[in-house]
Amino acid sequence: MQPFRGWTGTLILGMAIAGSLSGAQTARSAHDAARRRTDVRWQRAVEQAVREAPNARVLVLEASSGDLLASTRLAEAGRTLATPGSTLKPAILYFALASGRWDAERRVACSRRLRVGSHRLNCSHPIADPMNARQALTWSCNSYFAELAGTLSPRVLRQALEERGLLAATGLTAQEEIAAFREPRTREQVQLAALGVEGIRITLPELAEAYRSLAAEMAAHPETVATKTVSAGLRDSASFGMAGAASLGGVPVAGKTGTASAESGGATHGWFVGLAPAGSPRVVVVAVYLPSGRGSDAALVASKLLAHSPLRKP
């Protein structure tokens, strides 16, 4: 596949809107408002997509400018902090490869059974031979990413997250929550944070902005091993891998799902973040959060959005 080159286009993303403000807050509010320009076609696609998932938070942002084009449940999207699950894997893999801390061809065996601390994190992918980086991202192999994360220090993990803007305000809303990140102290805690199940909670705007940042980084360095590996893994994931439901909308997409529950346990919530059309100069970043469900459910919402979007050819 072709690496991501010169991506522009759209991104799905959440935003909360403030009430009366003054001074610096007024300036920030004006800046935020300038980033909101509703595109009727994308708004219609969002509304069609959530008919069967009325609690979904779905946001569409232009990737090049960051302009918000369409959304649903903006305020909740900006205020809801949740464990991100496997959606962190692309950013962490890219950082590890780009910084020379990991070899893309290193293979890790997976028995599909994994326990880290008190968490049982068994893989749901098919039985497979030891995987390299591209394959592990395609199938979201927890054993592989636990092994990778185990080589990172707490400081390096924080650096990987900060490079994508995951631990800071996005500036997309005046009343947004900021990621809750608990500094890991042990190897297990680093692994759990990297797998998105403990020690970190983020919002949909933060996650969408992180993928927008990652897309821009890969577009700026299209020939690197890091870009070729991560872009291929994301495309494979949304084509035939764990995020395959996203491709049902008839638009080529590269993306990642995440399924997680609160640190205390309980019902799962689902995420999907995708870039569409995959491998094209005109790109949409699709971010969906379901407060109840799985990543595959969120990917299905994204596929319905893309099926009704301006990207779908008649």
Question: Predicted segment positions?
Answer:
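Beta-lactamase-like hydrolase cores
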Residues: 28-64, 70-71
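Bacterial N-terminal signal peptides
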Residues: 10-20
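Glycine-rich, acidic and aromatic/proline-enriched surface loops and short helix-turn segments
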Residues: 51-55, 61-71, 97-102, 113, ...
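Bacterial N-terminal signal peptides that target proteins for export
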Residues: 1-11
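A penicillin-recognizing enzyme superfamily signal
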Residues: 40, 143-146, 150-158, 187-309
